[in-house]
Amino acid sequence: MMASGPPMAIAPIDQVRAVLDYATSAIEPGKILMGMSLYGYDWPLPYEKGRTRASGVSNNAAQNLAIAEKAPIIWDVKSASPYFEYMVAGVQHRVWFDDAQSAAIKLALVDEYQLRGVSVWVLGNEFPQLWYLLKDGYTIRKV
């Protein structure tokens, strides 16, 4: 999994809200499942439009990489998402991903917008905390 856009949060909260505002204006909210991504991206820096490619990384792998690199995880208030930076072979990297806090903020939108529920994207990349959040707040059905 690769990305070619600029380094940024996978699903910034303002963009998620904008999509939900539009979707709920056109479709009955009770018919909408909000998708949640279960991956992050690792961008080499500096970013060069049209040249830089980010590698996909699971949220769990991102957190483990931050621990291994002793990189502090930074909370971005605007996007309501975490990221960190690290250096390898003289190249700085920025990794954006979701964690329990960012997932909880997005899951709260289901009730706020009175949506039918959530669907998770790329099963197998989930982080353990997500299952606790989902189990405590929702009835899980495999469809």
Put a short name on every predicted segment:
Residues 10-17, 97-104, 125:
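Soluble non-cytosolic domains of exported or imported proteins
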Residues 98-100, 107-112, 123-143:
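Aromatic-rich peripheral "rim/lid" segments of glycoside hydrolase catalytic domains that contact
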Residues 34, 110, 118:
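Conserved, mostly hydrophobic/aromatic
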Residues 1-66:
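Substrate-binding surface in catalytic domains of secreted glycosidases
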Residues 59-113:
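Hydrophobic, secondary-structure "cap" segments at the distal end of domains
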Residues 38, 121-123:
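Structural motif
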Residues 4-6, 90-93, 135:
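A short, structure-level motif marking secondary-structure boundaries and short turns
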